[in-house]
Amino acid sequence: MRGGSKTAHEEAEAVMTAITLVQGDITRQSADAIVNAANSSLLGGGGVDGAIHRRGGPAILADCRRLRASHYGKGLPTGRAVATTAGELDARWVIHTVGPVFSREEDRSELLASCYRESLKVADELGARTVAFPAVSAGIYGWPMDDAARIAVETVRATRTAVEEVTFVLFDEPAYEAFATQVR
């Protein structure tokens, strides 16, 4: 430890991440970083992805296009995360992560957990202390809400991070209840 400052790893060990739940619209949340359940193209889509791009404005899409051109020509891989500006959202950054499509034939839970771990890693790299997550993969990607909530909460609790507060922003009462059951 030089000059009394802590390394990011030491800070991550010192912080216990608080988990809060909100029922509502993630695009109306105030946080250092808002996580987008993106599609691999990073160019917007349906659900949370479309809402974030619409409310955040053209700056988010412009950043996403730059990322596609410079690093992710074939798209962002499932389970990975990358940050852009937050545009007009009440945040400093949007962290885009690509969740897996649910499959009854193949266990993809590790890919879903990776979305949360990688998003927190990116948040740490940015210096974000508050992060708002949607229920990744639980919408149009068909992941059963109870299982999506279990994986999300267990992963956030198990991940070493300097993020002080994670807020799960759930779109309806059943989603909120599924996450509340896991947080208890």
Task: Spell out what each predicted region is.
Residues M1-R184:
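Macrodomain-like recognition of ADP-ribose-binding/processing modules
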